[in-house]
């Protein structure tokens, strides 16, 4: 009714796809046909930013409407890096070098400016070089700049107005209570207080102007596009040869589709669990049925509990094997534990399937369960290999666990 624009803001990476789903619903809603006030925020530090722009352009074409897009560099970098490490992702969803983000920002800006019929571009920046580059790229195209209240006045006083560049700048001011705004203000402090921040460097008299306005293309060429050498991939964050346990990103629709396909192949499988004894034939007995606690008509498998006689056999076998095993080097023991961990990860989906079906765990809890088992094996194997010696660390002998 009042043609007030509304932007869907950008937050952590795992919320991007659900935000795009919401954008699609709104843009294609029949009640909003012709309304050009629907906006979306895209973060240039995300590696998939250019492809998100392609998606928004395609969506605008399908809706025969124009979508407002605000391009920012991104304010959750620290948490994105940490989350990727904690979740055991294959790689980081964001760039690990600041100048890669700066270059991505300019590349995304050029792509947005080239889609005037589908996108109304808005560039949120306090970086003088980014501003000048966009002004040069844009020529006579329609767009606006944006800045935060209290931060961009010095820069944009030289941009706004007919006596300057004659460009529009929308000023963003946070509104709300202390409790609501605290997290927002902390993010702004972290973002602009970082040593690599343009705002931070601008007030530093030790930084020459030539270094302040360096072309990010030159920096990327100097490093041949390589990632930050101080950042190992998420699976290689631990010292030595210890590998982080692999996780799954449940916010990624492609990974969800693959997970669904992998898990479905095991639903028809019925498992049998019984005592496993060396040189001893387990007697036949009535097995106990195990059902899925979340779906009672789903029989997961059958369990045959050990008898007292079989426990005696297991203990006897362990006692017979103990002298040879206790003489095995810690490195060999660690290698076997590592192999066990690798085999669990090789059978990742089936392990997850069993945890979900037998214990009734959610997918996220099941993934954490499998990862914990793998990680414990690798953690203690590393300790055994590096810190144990048969001359100083004596085994306590066979132990029966119930």
What are these regions (language model features)?
Residues 164, 180-183, 187-316, 320, ...:
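Terminal low-complexity tails and localization/encapsulation signals of metabolic enzymes
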Residues 3, 23-30, 322-326, 359, ...:
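Structural motif corresponding to the C-terminal cap of alpha-helices
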Residues 3-7, 38, 92-95, 115-120, ...:
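Glycine- and acidic
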């Amino acid at each position: 009714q009042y043609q007030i624009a509304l932007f869907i803001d950008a937050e952590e990476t795992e919320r991007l796809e659900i935000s795009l789903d919401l954008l699609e619903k709104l843009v294609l809603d029949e009640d909003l046909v012709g309304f050009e006030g629907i906006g979306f925020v895209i973060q240039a530090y995300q590696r998939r930013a250019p492809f998100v722009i392609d998606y928004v352009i395609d969506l605008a074409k399908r809706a025969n409407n124009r979508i407002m897009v605000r391009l920012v560099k991104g304010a959750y970098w620290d948490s994105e890096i940490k989350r990727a490490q904690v979740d055991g992702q294959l790689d980081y969803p964001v760039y690990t070098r600041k100048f890669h983000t700066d270059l991505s920002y300019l590349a995304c800006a050029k792509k947005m400016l080239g889609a005037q019929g589908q996108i109304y571009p808005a560039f949120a920046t306090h970086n003088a070089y980014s501003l000048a580059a966009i002004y040069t790229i844009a020529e006579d195209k329609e767009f606006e700049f944006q800045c935060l209240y209290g931060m961009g006045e010095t820069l944009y006083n030289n941009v706004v107005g007919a006596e300057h560049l004659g460009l529009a700048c929308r000023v963003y001011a946070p509104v709300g209570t202390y409790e609501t705004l605290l997290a927002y203000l902390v993010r702004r402090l972290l973002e602009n207080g970082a040593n690599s921040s343009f705002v931070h460097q601008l007030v530093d008299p030790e930084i020459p102007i030539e270094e302040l306005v360096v072309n990010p293309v030159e920096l990327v060429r100097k490093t041949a596009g390589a990632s930050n050498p101080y950042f190992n991939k998420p699976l290689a964050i631990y010292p030595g040869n210890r590998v982080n346990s692999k996780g799954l990103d449940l916010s990624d629709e492609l990974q969800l589709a693959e997970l669904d396909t992998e898990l479905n192949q095991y639903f028809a499988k019925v498992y049998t669990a019984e005592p496993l004894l060396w040189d001893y034939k387990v007697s036949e007995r009535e097995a106990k049925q195990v059902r899925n606690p979340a779906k009672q008509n789903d029989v997961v498998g059958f369990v045959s509990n050990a008898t007292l006689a079989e426990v005696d056999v297991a203990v006897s076998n362990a006692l017979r094997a103990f002298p040879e095993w206790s003489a095995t080097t810690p490195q060999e023991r660690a290698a076997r534990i590592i192999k066990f961990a690798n085999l669990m990860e090789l059978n990742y989906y089936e392990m997850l399937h069993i945890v979900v079906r037998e214990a009734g765990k959610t997918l996220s809890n099941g993934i954490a369960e499998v990862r914990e088992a793998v990680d414990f094996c690798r953690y203690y194997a590393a300790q055994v290999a590096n810190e144990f010696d048969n001359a100083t660390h004596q085994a306590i002998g066979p132990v029966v666990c119930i």
